[in-house]
Structures are given as structure tokens and as C-alpha cells.
């Protein structure tokens, strides 16, 4: 059907059922011989499960796409090779600024060329996953970021945020234990990030994750980082990342002359 709509500029696809019927999924995963090019498509939105999304993106090309908005239902594992290829080969989705926000019922990964669009408005790229538990959100976000590494490796400024009452960690979330390795897995794909901004509600979580184990000894972890900007509300918290910063300074200043500021 899409072949008959070469002038299509906006396309929205949505499913209300979280899980696909097995037979329907097999049919969707059967790719066309040649992808359909939608030469003037500028806005694409999708709501459903990852298998449907990935299958659909394998079958289209949208060289002039300006905005991609995705909402996925929660699932145990995210394997999105065609989404990764689609974002990496679409010129309008090569973006320098990203923000990962954790909310009460979902988390989102958004990216744009302007900071104000990432924080408010309509970003060029947004991917939202519906799930409630904080530890599950972090795990899913790590999987999503890993799947989108080709795209996220070009991000230069990254913000980690929490959207809630007073922007503070809820009581039920405080009981969720997130392994430090999972946080590092989430940050790992951002190899081009020069700035990392962290909201005050996540400072303790991130400081523990970045200072545990031998993460600071790995030059492949956040290799381009120059500015670490945690948001502090506690006067005694300004040394939360001191150990991590000191390790990076020792390893990197001597080798590449980069500067790192807190």
C-alpha cells in the first residue's frame, strides 16, 4: 500500500494490544524484497511492540524524515537491529543532544539538535517505553541504548533526568536495587559524549555506579567526556564523583590532554 503513496508526509501507526499474535508476528517479520522509499515523509510515529516496529522499518526508507516518535510496550528483551540501521542511515536523525528521562510509568530517550527541543516541545527523535519499576526501567534503557549505539555514539551532550513530584526518587523506587554495571551499560554507547548532566535525584545512584569496581580504569568508557555536571542540592555532596574524576584525570590527561570539570 505504501508504494502507492509517494507523496505521504506524515504517517502514524498504532496498536492497542501489547503482545502480537504469533502468526501475525511471523508475517510481519517476512521482509519485502525491496524496501519502499517514501521520498517526502517527514513525520513518523509508532506505538506498539518492538517486533512490529523493527519489521516495519526494515521495509521502508525515508531520506527526508525530520521526526520519529516511538512508544513501545514493555517487554523482557529489546532487539532492534532495523531501528538501529534506520536511525543511523537517516540524515535527519543524526543528532548531538540527548536526554534520558525516568518517569513514574515509563522512561524515554529523546534526541534533537537543540537543547530546548530535548527538554520541551517536539524532539526529532523520541523513544518511550511503558514500564513502572525503576530497576526495570534502567535495564530496558540499557538495552535500548545498546541497540541504538550507532546513533547514540554521535551524541555530544547527554542528560539523565527524573520526572516526578519535586524531581525526587519515589519511596517505592528507593527499594529497587540497580546494579552499577547496568548503569555503566546504559552509558557505554555514548562514546562521543563530551558533557554528562545528571539531575540531583540520580546523583547518588550514578556516583555509586561510576565509582564501583574498576570502571574508571577502562579508557573505552565515556572516552570523550570533558564535562561532568551533576546537579547538587546537598552542600556536602560536591565530592560525590571525586574518585571517578580523579581516575579519569590520571588516565586521560597524560594520554590525550583532555580536561574534565565537575
What are these regions (language model features)?
Residues 1-262:
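Leucine-rich repeat
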